[in-house]
From Swiss-Prot:
Location within or outside the cell: Nucleus; Cytoplasm
Keyword Nucleus among UniProt keywords: yes
Keywords: Cytoplasm, Nucleus
GO aspect biological process, one term: erythrocyte differentiation
Job description of the protein: May play a role in erythroid cell differentiation.
Family annotation (InterPro entries): CDIN1 (IPR029404)
Protein name: CDAN1-interacting nuclease 1
GO cellular component: cytoplasm; nucleus
Species the sequence originates in: Danio rerio (Zebrafish)
Transmembrane segments: none
Length: 300
């Protein structure tokens, strides 16, 4: 399972259009999103420019591209000297402009995710207050529940960052998890509608499997003429970086262990990535319609 942040803009069970896009178009979109910040407004901008793609696909593409951007710049923002400058700048501003969205403004000025900046500033505050580096658990708890932060002004500013960041933060993590589960439920429902017997990830773990796809079919099926033993649900867009990572960390091992399978990128994928069918990995942007049981004929 994997999911994109944000709301589910399209139904999980119905295809609104073909969500495969060529690599050239993907690059055009990725160049466009370089100028955008991770705010709710950015989605309106994307939908205005790319009207043929649903919001869920655009959000997934933007989120993945923005996360790449943040990873490239993270070392610069994590420098102790830079952090001291950011923190002191925030504390000085909070003295006179406490009611303003100071951390959101600072995040925009230094080109850093609001939720990531909030985490860094909270860490600086707790380290200054307690003279020790806070644990990850303490940080996570306070980011999830800002009322736990002793400084009420800082708590308000951190909450603003969490609410307004569509790529990072505890709120986004919860939404991503929920969307991932929603699409897994849709996959199971589609299989049951076609009377296809399967074991899901939870059932496989009970049987002692550790690393498994979302679905193992008890009786293989054929999709587009290719045999499928397993299905993996990805509530995200399949770009080069994410797909290659999944190939190396998941899909090839599934193939070696269970045979050929199907990956569903519910929010679409780069069409050129569907090039491993002969090696056992088939890509789809929704539940397939061309399904044949290997022992019972076409499914109705």
């Amino acid at each position: 399972m994997d999911a994109v942040s944000g709301g589910s803009a399209t139904g999980t069970g119905e295809q609104v259009n073909n969500l495969r896009i060529c690599r050239a178009e993907y690059r055009s979109i990725s160049r466009f999103v370089e100028q955008l910040r991770p705010t709710r407004q950015c989605m309106k901008t994307l939908q205005t420019h790319f009207t043929h793609l649903p919001a869920s696909t655009l959000l997934s593409i933007f989120s993945q591209e923005y996360q790449k951007r943040m990873k490239r710049s993270m070392a610069r923002h994590h420098s102790p000297e830079v952090l001291r400058v950011y923190y002191q700048r925030y504390r000085d501003e909070a003295e006179t402009r406490a009611t303003e969205p100071l951390l959101l403004e600072l995040a925009n000025q230094v080109d850093l995710s609001p939720a990531l900046l909030a985490r860094l500033m909270l860490e600086c505050f707790l380290e200054e207050r307690n003279a020790s580096v806070p644990s990850r658990q303490v940080l996570n708890n306070m980011l999830r529940e800002p009322y736990l932060i002793p400084d009420l002004v800082l708590a308000k500013h951190i909450e603003q960052c969490t609410v307004n960041d569509c790529c990072y933060g505890p709120l986004v993590d919860c939404i991503k998890h929920a969307i991932g589960l929603e699409h897994e439920d849709t996959l199971r429902d589609k299989l049951r509608e076609r009377n296809l017997s399967f074991l899901d990830e939870n059932q496989l773990r009970v049987k002692g499997y550790d690393k498994t796809p979302d679905i193992i079919l008890e009786v293989p099926i054929a999709v587009d003429g290719h045999i499928v033993h397993w299905i993996e649900s990805k509530a995200s867009f399949g770009d080069d970086h994410s797909h290659n990572t999944y190939l190396n960390e998941q899909f090839w091992s599934y193939c070696n262990r269970f045979g050929p399978g199907l990956v569903i990128y519910w929010f679409g994928f780069i069409s050129e990535l569907d090039c491993q069918r002969e090696r056992g990995i088939l890509l789809k942007d929704g539940f397939p319609t061309d399904i044949s049981s290997l022992c019972a004929g076409p499914q109705r």
